[in-house]
């Protein structure tokens, strides 16, 4: 492991070993300990007491963060011609169909989200090898396969994200930027955690939320006390 810089040592010294911080404290502290020269992402890791290998314990969902993600989300709308104007007006960065399908087949993936329609999914199935590994495959459960293309584009642009538990039982996502206020980070974290709580599988036994950590790009993780999620 490389040696810590002076800035990193100072940041590390601000975290009390073994302490679980309130969600408000952690949201303020993550801003203090970030030493990057760019607007780093604020990440959250929630470890769940589930067995993701069992289909009835898979946790997957969508959430619209109250303050957005702080990221510029590049949206491709693969839709029929009659929906193109609606998609463009909603803010889609790329709108079309066959020409973009051919681009993707050739390896183009400079996008963050694809919105499409049920009638078009047959054409998109062949793109699974390219889109699947990158997490770009549209899915009805995440609201990215719909006839209401305009509304779906607006939701994604406003900060809607989809998530799922990984094979180790952790849900990981970015919930903002360090340039956000501590209150904005707290609000986004709270919304994300409460959404996960609502999705608790009925078959999950024991403690559901095992641990919560907040961090930023290249920062140390800050342990959050789950009991404080709804505290101000």
UniProtKB/Swiss-Prot annotation:
Q: Check the record and name the InterPro entries matching this protein.
A: Ribosom_uL1_bac-type (IPR005878), Ribosomal_uL1 (IPR002143), Ribosomal_uL1-like (IPR023674), Ribosomal_uL1/biogenesis (IPR028364), Ribosomal_uL1_3-a/b-sand (IPR016095), Ribosomal_uL1_CS (IPR023673)
- Family matches, as Gene3D superfamilies: 3.30.190.20, 3.40.50.790
Self-association state and partner proteins as the record states: Part of the 50S ribosomal subunit.
Q: Keywords in alphabetical order, please.
A: Repressor, Ribonucleoprotein, Ribosomal protein, RNA-binding, rRNA-binding, Translation regulation, tRNA-binding
Q: Which PROSITE patterns match?
A: RIBOSOMAL_L1 (PS01199)
Family statement? Belongs to the universal ribosomal protein uL1 family.
GO molecular function terms attached to this record: rRNA binding; structural constituent of ribosome; tRNA binding
Output the GO biological process annotations, alphabetical, semicolon-separated. Answer: regulation of translation; translation
Q: Could you give one GO CC term from the UniProt record?
A: large ribosomal subunit
The protein's name: Large ribosomal subunit protein uL1
Q: Which PANTHER family does its entry note?
A: 54S RIBOSOMAL PROTEIN L1, MITOCHONDRIAL, LARGE RIBOSOMAL SUBUNIT PROTEIN UL1M
Q: According to the entry, what is the taxonomic lineage of the organism? A: Bacteria, Pseudomonadati, Bacteroidota, Bacteroidia, Bacteroidales
NCBIfam families, from UniProt? Answer: rplA_bact (TIGR01169)
